[in-house]
C-alpha cells in the first residue's frame, strides 16, 4: 500500500465496503457524539467521513486533532445505515472506521476558518491566502480557471493555431498604461520593462511567416485597481493571424469563446447572435462601450421635443453647439416613488438629477403624462416622446442633457440601475456584442491629440484618412463585450511603415522616437509584412464571469490587494543596499 494513501477522499463507495484503506488529508471538522468521533477528512478531490469509537486503536489520538491538521488514516470501509447516507457527498454511502492515525502536519490556531463560507476581511484572507484557498468556493474557482485554460488551449489547437512563447522582459513601449521597469545590472542607467502585452512580438511572429499564433500570456501593467481588473498583472489569451480582415478574426474567435461559455456556463443560455455595434451607437444607446445587452433598455436622442419648449433648462441648453437631450426609457417604472429614487441615484453619481415623465391612468380613465417635465412641455410634446420611445401606461422615461461626453457615463450607469431595479435585466444568460469603429484618436486632459486605443491599429481609410481631422478617423479596432464587461480587445494592424509614422506623428511622436521605441517592428515591416490582425481575451475576467463573481481577486490564485500589495509575500519590499549598489541606484526620498 502507498505510504500516504490507497485512495483519494472522493473515490470510495459501496463497492469498497470491507476493504482496508489508507487516506491522507486535512481535518475538515470533528464532531464528538458521546464517545464516538466523526471526522471529515478532506483532500483536493473531496471529503470522506472517518469514525472512531472507544474500541478503535486510533480513538485516543484522534481526540487530539484539530481543524486543518494534516493526518493519515488507516481503516476499514463500512457501509452507512440507509438513514445516514449523505447524497451531497460522492462518498456519502460509506465511512471509514479508523484503526490507525498519524499526524503529518499539525496546525496552529486558525486566523480564519476553512469550514463554512463565513465572510472575513480581505486583508486577513490575502495574508493567509493558502488557508483561504482551502475553502470550497475558492477551490472551485481555481479549478474552474485551470479547466478554462486547458479548454482554451485545446480549442485553439483544434482551430489550427500554434502556441509560441514571447519574452517576459523587453523594452518599454507606450501601450496605454505605465510600465513596470526593471533596472539592468550589466547596463547601468538602462532599464528593461515587463511587457504590457506581447503586442510587438506577436506581430513580428506574423512577419516571420507563421500564420496563426496564440499564447496564454502574462501581462504587466502598473494600473489603478478596479473590481474587474488586477493592478499589476493578468493573463490573456493572445491571438494573431495573417492575411485576415476584421470579420475573419471574428469568425475564428466566436467558436472558441462561445464553446467555452457553453462548456463552463453552468447551463446558462449562450446567445449565438453576436451583433456588430459601432462605438458611437454603443455610447448613444447604452452609455458604455461594453454594454450589457441582457438589459433591453435603449437610450434615444429626443432633442427635437425640447427645443423651444417650456422647459427652459433644456431649451436653453440646446442653443449651445454639440448639446443634446437623451431619454432613458423605463418600462413598468411609472410611479413617482420610483422616479424620485432614480433621480436621487443620478445625484449620487455627481449630476444635478434627471428629469422624468411617467404615464398613468387619469381621473377620467384615459392615459395621462405626469411629472415635472410633463407640466413644462405640454401634452403634445409628451405624447410625441411617448410614441418615439414606444412606451405606454405604467411606464416612465428619464432625461439627461448637455454635451454627451459630460453625461454618457452616468446615463449608462442609470440605465443599468433602472434595468436592475425593474427586473428587466435577463438572468442566466450570456449576451455578446462586437463593438467596432472605435475612434483612432481622442483629446487627452491637456487637449492634445492622443491614441484612444491600441496605437498599432490600421486607420480606416489608410493614409488618406490621416490627412484630415484626426478626431474623425476610425480605426480597425474592436472589443467584445459580454454582460457589461469587456472580454476581448483587438484590431487589424498597421503593417505599413509610412502609415505608422503618420499615425504616430498625429499623436505627437516624431519619426525618430517611433524608430527608437519600435525599431524592431519598423525594421521588420520594411522586409515584407503581411496584412495581419488579432485580439486578446482577458482570462481573469472570463473566469470571473463564469464563476459569477463580482471581484476579480476571487478567481486569481495569489492576487494583490487594492493598493497593489502582496500581503502574503510582503511585496513590494525595500531592496538591500547591496542590491542598490549592484544596480547603481539610490532611493530618492519623497518630498
UniProtKB/Swiss-Prot annotation:
GO annotation, cellular component aspect: cytoplasm
Site (Important for tRNA non-discrimination) residue list: 33
GO biological process, one term: aspartyl-tRNA aminoacylation
Places the protein is found: Cytoplasm
Binding site for ATP: 221-223, 486, 538-541
Enzyme class, spelled out: ligase
Entry-linked PROSITE patterns: AA_TRNA_LIGASE_II
Pfam families named in the record: GAD (PF02938), tRNA-synt_2 (PF00152), tRNA_anti-codon (PF01336)
Catalytic activity: tRNA(Asx) + L-aspartate + ATP = L-aspartyl-tRNA(Asx) + AMP + diphosphate
Sequence segments annotated as region (Aspartate): 199-202
Binding, L-aspartate: 175, 221, 453, 493
Keywords: Aminoacyl-tRNA synthetase, ATP-binding, Cytoplasm, Ligase, Nucleotide-binding, Protein biosynthesis
InterPro entries xrefs: Aa-tRNA-synt_II (IPR004364), aa-tRNA-synth_II (IPR006195), aa-tRNA-synth_II/BPL/LPL (IPR045864), Asp-tRNA-ligase_1 (IPR004524), Asp-tRNA-ligase_1_N (IPR047089), Asp/Asn-tRNA-synth_IIb (IPR002312), GAD-like_sf (IPR004115), GAD_dom (IPR029351)
Protein family membership: Belongs to the class-II aminoacyl-tRNA synthetase family. Type 1 subfamily.
Quaternary structure annotation from Swiss-Prot or TrEMBL: Homodimer.
HAMAP family attached to this UniProt entry: Asp_tRNA_synth_type1
Biological role stated in the UniProt entry: Aspartyl-tRNA synthetase with relaxed tRNA specificity since it is able to aspartylate not only its cognate tRNA(Asp) but also tRNA(Asn). Reaction proceeds in two steps: L-aspartate is first activated by ATP to form Asp-AMP and then transferred to the acceptor end of tRNA(Asp/Asn).
NCBIfam families reported for this sequence: aspS_bact (TIGR00459), PRK00476.1 (NF001750)
Identification of the protein by name: Aspartate--tRNA(Asp/Asn) ligase
Lineage: Bacteria, Pseudomonadati, Pseudomonadota, Alphaproteobacteria, Rhodobacterales
Amino acid at each position: 500500500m502507498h505510504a500516504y494513501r490507497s485512495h483519494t477522499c472522493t473515490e470510495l463507495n459501496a463497492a469498497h465496503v470491507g476493504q482496508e484503506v489508507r487516506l491522507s488529508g486535512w481535518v475538515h471538522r470533528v464532531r464528538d457524539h458521546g464517545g464516538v468521533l466523526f471526522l471529515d477528512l478532506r483532500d483536493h478531490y473531496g471529503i470522506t467521513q472517518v469514525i472512531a469509537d472507544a474500541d478503535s486503536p486510533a480513538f485516543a489520538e484522534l481526540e487530539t486533532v484539530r481543524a486543518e491538521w494534516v493526518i493519515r488514516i488507516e481503516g476499514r470501509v463500512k457501509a452507512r445505515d440507509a438513514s445516514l447516507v449523505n447524497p451531497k457527498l460522492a462518498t456519502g454511502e460509506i465511512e471509514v472506521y479508523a484503526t490507525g492515525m498519524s499526524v503529518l502536519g499539525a496546525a496552529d490556531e486558525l486566523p480564519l476558518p476553512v469550514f463554512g463560507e463565513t465572510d472575513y476581511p480581505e486583508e486577513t484572507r490575502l495574508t493567509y491566502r493558502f488557508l483561504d484557498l482551502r475553502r470550497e468556493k475558492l477551490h472551485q474557482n481555481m479549478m474552474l480557471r485551470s479547466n478554462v485554460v486547458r479548454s482554451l488551449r485545446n480549442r485553439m489547437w483544434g482551430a489550427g493555431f500554434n502556441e509560441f512563447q514571447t519574452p517576459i522582459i523587453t523594452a518599454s513601449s507606450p501601450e496605454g498604461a505605465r510600465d513596470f521597469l526593471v533596472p539592468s545590472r550589466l547596463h547601468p542607467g538602462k532599464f528593461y520593462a515587463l511587457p504590457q502585452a506581447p503586442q510587438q512580438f506577436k506581430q513580428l511572429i506574423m512577419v516571420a511567416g507563421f500564420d496563426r499564433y496564440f499564447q496564454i500570456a502574462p501581462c504587466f501593467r502598473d494600473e489603478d485597481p478596479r473590481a474587474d481588473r488586477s493592478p499589476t498583472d493578468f493573463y490573456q489569451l493572445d491571438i494573431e493571424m495573417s492575411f485576415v480582415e476584421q470579420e475573419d478574426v471574428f469568425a475564428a474567435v466566436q467558436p472558441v469563446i462561445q464553446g467555452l461559455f457553453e462548456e463552463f456556463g453552468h447551463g446558462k443560455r449562450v446567445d449565438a447572435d453576436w451583433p456588430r455595434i459601432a462605438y458611437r451607437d454603443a455610447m448613444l444607446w447604452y452609455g458604455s462601450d461594453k454594454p450589457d445587452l441582457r438589459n433591453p433598455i435603449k437610450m434615444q436622442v429626443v432633442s427635437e421635443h425640447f427645443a423651444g419648449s417650456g422647459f427652459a433648462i433644456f431649451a436653453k441648453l440646446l442653443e449651445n453647439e454639440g448639446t443634446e437631450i437623451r431619454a432613458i426609457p423605463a418600462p413598468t417604472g411609472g410611479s413617482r416613488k420610483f422616479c424620485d429614487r432614480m433621480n436621487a441615484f443620478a445625484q449620487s453619481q455627481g449630476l444635478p438629477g434627471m428629469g422624468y415623465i411617467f404615464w398613468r391612468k387619469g381621473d377620467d380613465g384615459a392615459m395621462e403624462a405626469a411629472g415635472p417635465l410633463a407640466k413644462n412641455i405640454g401634452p403634445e410634446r409628451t405624447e410625441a416622446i411617448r410614441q418615439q420611445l414606444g412606451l405606454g401606461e405604467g411606464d416612465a422615461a428619464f432625461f439627461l442633457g448637455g454635451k454627451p461626453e459630460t453625461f454618457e457615463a452616468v446615463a449608462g450607469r442609470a440605465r443599468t440601475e433602472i434595468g436592475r431595479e425593474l427586473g428587466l435585466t435577463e438572468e442566466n444568460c450570456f449576451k455578446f456584442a462586437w463593438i467596432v469603429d472605435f475612434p483612432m484618436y481622442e483629446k487627452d486632459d491637456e487637449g492634445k491629440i492622443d491614441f484612444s486605443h491600441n496605437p498599432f491599429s490600421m486607420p480606416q481609410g489608410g493614409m488618406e484618412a490621416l490627412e484630415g481631422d484626426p478626431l474623425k478617423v476610425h480605426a480597425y479596432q474592436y472589443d467584445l463585450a459580454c454582460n457589461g464587461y469587456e472580454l476581448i480587445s483587438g484590431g487589424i494592424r498597421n503593417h505599413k511603415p509610412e502609415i505608422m509614422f503618420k499615425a504616430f506623428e498625429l499623436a505627437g511622436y516624431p519619426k525618430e522616437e517611433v524608430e527608437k521605441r519600435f525599431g524592431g517592428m519598423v525594421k521588420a515591416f520594411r522586409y515584407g509584412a503581411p496584412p495581419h490582425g488579432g485580439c486578446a481575451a482577458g482570462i481573469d475576467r472570463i473566469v470571473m464571469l463564469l464563476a459569477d463573481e463580482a471581484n476579480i481577486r476571487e478567481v486569481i490564485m495569489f492576487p494583490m490587494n487594492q493598493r497593489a500589495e502582496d500581503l502574503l509575500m510582503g511585496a513590494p519590499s525595500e531592496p538591500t543596499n547591496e542590491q542598490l549598489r549592484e544596480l547603481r541606484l539610490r532611493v530618492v526620498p519623497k518630498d
